[in-house]
């Protein structure tokens, strides 16, 4: 039995100083538990890029709603500090000190998918090669259980964006998200 629950009318549109670019694994467009969609609906200066869709593969309603644009270097601006949010071997912990060191506005690029899919996106997406990777500091386990996770500190895309915003733009902005 599938419960029908839509949160769309509860989302308050918000424009951040930080630009959010979500690079979504194509299989995520088939999942109703995808929290990146909520983030995109709420955050006015966000973009979603679908990655890995095979040519000729039918588009899901979610993919059609968000767009079918592929991520490329053209999505990156030299006028902004482009950061990939994912805990990789090369990522540094996002902190107030790091944020203050940037002279340009920030674009936060967030891989979206299962943990396995999301880990592959920065490695396989040529446009993300050479960008600085950041990770969230240790925090409490997720407040949400949209899916079964293998580790209590794995969090959904929406929650990761919110926690990053607490550091980038302050706790008030994170609470609004």
Give residue ranges: language-model regions.
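Cys/His-rich short segments
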Residues: 1-19
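Short hydrophobic beta-strand segments
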Residues: 19-26, 81-86
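Short, acidic/turn-prone active-site loops that include or flank metal/cofactor-
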Residues: 26-28, 53-54, 89-90, 136-141
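Short, charged, surface-exposed secondary-structure boundary motifs
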Residues: 32-33, 58-61, 141-147
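Histidine-anchored nucleotide/phosphate-binding helix
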Residues: 33-41
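S-adenosyl-L-methionine/SAH cofactor-binding core of RNA-modifying enzymes
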Residues: 41-119, 123
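C-terminal folded domains that constitute the principal catalytic or ligand-binding module
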Residues: 107, 115-177
């Amino acid at each position: 039995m599938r419960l029908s629950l839509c949160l769309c009318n509860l989302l308050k549109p918000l424009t951040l100083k930080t630009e959010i670019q979500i690079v979504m694994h194509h299989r995520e467009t088939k999942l109703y538990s995808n929290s990146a969609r909520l983030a995109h609906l709420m955050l006015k200066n966000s973009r979603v890029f679908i990655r890995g869709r095979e040519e000729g593969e039918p588009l899901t309603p979610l993919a059609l709603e968000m767009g079918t644009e592929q991520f490329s270097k053209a999505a990156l601006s030299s006028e902004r500090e482009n950061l990939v949010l994912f805990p990789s071997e090369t990522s540094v912990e996002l902190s107030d000190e790091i944020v203050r060191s940037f002279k340009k506005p920030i674009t936060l690029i967030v891989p979206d998918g299962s943990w396995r899919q999301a880990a592959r996106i920065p490695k396989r997406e040529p446009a993300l090669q050479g960008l600085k990777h950041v990770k969230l500091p240790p925090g409490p386990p997720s407040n949400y259980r949209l899916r079964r996770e293998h580790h209590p500190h794995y969090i959904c895309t929406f929650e990761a964006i919110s926690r990053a915003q607490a550091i980038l733009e302050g706790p008030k902005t994170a609470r609004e998200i």
